[in-house]
Amino acid sequence: MADLKTNLLGFVMNSPVIGASGTVGYGVEYEELADFAKIGGISGKGLTLHGQYGNKGERLWETPSGLINSIGLQNPGVQHFIDVELPELLELKQKYGTVAIANLGGHSEEEYVEGASMLSDSAVDIVELNISCPNVKVGGMAYGVKAEAAGEVVRMVRAACKKPLMVKLSPQAENIPEMCKAVEAAGADAISLTNTFQACAIDLEKRRPVFNNIFAGLSGPAVRPIALRMVWQAVGAVNIPVVGLGGIATGRDALEFIMAGAAAVQVGAANFANPRAMETIADEMAAWMDKNGVKTLDEIRGCARNAE
């Protein structure tokens, strides 16, 4: 019988399958739909220091093999999360062992640091730092584009945060290996990648861009091979765990990331198509392992790299 248990930053998870931020709410919304005993962790909806209403206009747009979103980090703010949503997330942990991950964004170094400090004093298990947010001090360029800027914000957050720190990287980074090395040197305990890919859609009838901000984030099966390439690069660049995400929709998809060296995986857009996607992926992983005589994920983690 396959054993999917996965150790991530000292937390032993039921499986390597984590719900990606922005696709599973704060976990409790899925409790009646999914078997949480098969889910390793939940990365809650992205937070900012202060609550945000998010973007106006269209927010979701389907593509032939993916989903474009322009939510705009709508969230209640860090303190509200600590007071209201986190206790519900921790109830899931108590019932099922699901690791509680807080995803934190920000629009300045000061916002990141204050938010991380508050989360550091909370009962959350892991802080996932979203550095795809625009830096208002440099004309809106995302922190996750240049390694130097990313390293600086991670260094500042590391000093303020006692919790295990996982940094979520953008595929728009100028150089993925250098970005990974920069955030590792700055104190990241783990890396997750990739975030969504910048995309655009045009409404032919309205003769204008679908989204008010013109560009938005593409996720889903279309991006998976590119995300897998970036995870491969990341694993080869650093000595900290890499959590892979981007278009994972089946157990075979997840196993590709594991064989590339990922410590765990996150599932995002697939949850919109199938609210039981996470447990289905875990089941499919276990079935493949049983069929192929693999007892634990450690037996195959990074095995594809032997061909290098």
Q: How would you name each of these model-derived features?
A:
Residues T48-Y53, P134-V136, Q198-A201, F272-N274:
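Short gly/pro/ser/thr-enriched loop/turn and capping motifs at secondary-structure boundaries
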Residues H107-V243, R252-E256, A260-V267:
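Alpha/beta enzyme core
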Residues M1-A100, G106:
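N-terminal capping/small domains of soluble enzymes
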